């Protein structure tokens, strides 16, 4: 009886892991699709007068979708 309870708990834990992993994969796919749309519509908002090498290197409009600001020509 005790081994059946342990087996049932392990089976439930395994099923939960599978469900959580599947949800995370679906979320990653949705984030990639949304990120692609955001990258295409990324607009630079830093004026060229305030454009420095540090800002060009470190400023990002959408951090999660890897949409970098171009910061003009610097």
UniProtKB/Swiss-Prot annotation:
SUPFAM superfamilies reported in the protein's UniProt record: Crisp domain-like
Reported function: Inhibits voltage-gated potassium channels (Kv) with higher potency for Kv1.1/KCNA1 and Kv1.3/KCNA3.
Signal peptide (from-to): 1-22
Organism per entry: Stichodactyla mertensii (Merten's carpet sea anemone)
Coiled coil: none
Keywords, ordered alphabetically: Cleavage on pair of basic residues, Disulfide bond, Ion channel impairing toxin, Nematocyst, Neurotoxin, Potassium channel impairing toxin, Secreted, Signal, Toxin, Voltage-gated potassium channel impairing toxin
Molecular function via GO: potassium channel regulator activity; toxin activity
Residues annotated as domain ShKT: 42-74
Main location: secreted
Propeptide residue intervals: 23-39
Protein name according to UniProt: Kappa-stichotoxin-Smt1a
Higher taxonomy: Eukaryota, Metazoa, Cnidaria, Anthozoa, Hexacorallia
Sites marked Key residue for binding both Kv1.2/KCNA2 and Kv1.3/KCNA3 (occludes the channel pore like a cork in a bottle): 61
Gene Ontology cellular-component annotations: extracellular region; nematocyst
Family to which this protein belongs: Belongs to the sea anemone type 1 potassium channel toxin family. Type 1a subfamily.
Record site feature (Important residue for binding Kv1.3/KCNA3), residues: 46, 48, 50, 59-60, 62, 66
Entry's localization field: Secreted; Nematocyst
Disulfide feature: 42-74, 51-67, 56-71
């Amino acid at each position: 009886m005790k081994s059946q309870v342990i087996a049932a708990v392990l089976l439930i834990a395994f099923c939960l892991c599978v469900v959580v992993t599947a949800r995370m994969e679906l979320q990653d796919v949705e984030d990639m699709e949304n990120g692609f749309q955001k990258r295409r519509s990324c607009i630079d908002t830093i004026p060229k007068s305030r454009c420095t090498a540090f800002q060009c290197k470190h400023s990002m409009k959408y951090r999660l979708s890897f949409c970098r600001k171009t910061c003009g020509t610097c």
